[in-house]
Curated annotation (Swiss-Prot):
This is Aspartyl/glutamyl-tRNA(Asn/Gln) amidotransferase subunit C. GO terms for biological process: glutaminyl-tRNAGln biosynthesis via transamidation; regulation of translational fidelity; translation. Belongs to the GatC family. NCBIfam families: gatC. Heterotrimer of A, B and C subunits. SUPFAM superfamilies: Glu-tRNAGln amidotransferase C subunit (SSF141000). Its EC number is 6.3.5.-. Pfam families: GatC (PF02686). It comes from Prochlorococcus marinus subsp. pastoris (strain CCMP1986 / NIES-2087 / MED4). Keywords: ATP-binding, Ligase, Nucleotide-binding, Protein biosynthesis. Coiled coil: none annotated. PANTHER family: GLUTAMYL-TRNA(GLN) AMIDOTRANSFERASE SUBUNIT C, MITOCHONDRIAL. It comes from the Bacteria.
């Protein structure tokens, strides 16, 4: 089994914005090795006759259908906003074009 180096764990921790001490680095290296060993075992399983799926459990949409409703006192709500433009809330731009 290939040993996962401390440098590899540190790199992954850096990408995940985690601060790890030496003890945690060693602990995570061991855990990652066990995970990779488990994946190797899974790769040996014959899945030739198993149909492809996107999920292990079927997902059903349980959301209600949207219904348009008029609100008579919309001005009251708009007046509570820190900033507005006509009949809309005005919010800071967060996506660059």
């Amino acid at each position: 089994m290939k040993r996962i180096s401390s440098d590899e764990v540190k790199k992954v921790a850096q990408l995940a914005r985690l601060e790890l001490n030496e003890s945690e680095i060693n602990q995570h290296a061991e855990q990652l090795e066990k995970i990779l060993e488990y994946i190797k075992q899974l790769e040996k399983i014959n899945t030739e006759d198993i149909p492809c799926t996107t999920r292990a459990i079927e997902v059903v949409n349980v959301l209600r259908k949207d219904e348009k409703k008029n609100y008579e006192n919309s001005e009251e709500i708009l007046d509570l906003a820190p900033s507005r433009e006509n009949k809309f809330f005005k919010v800071p731009k967060i996506i660059n074009e």
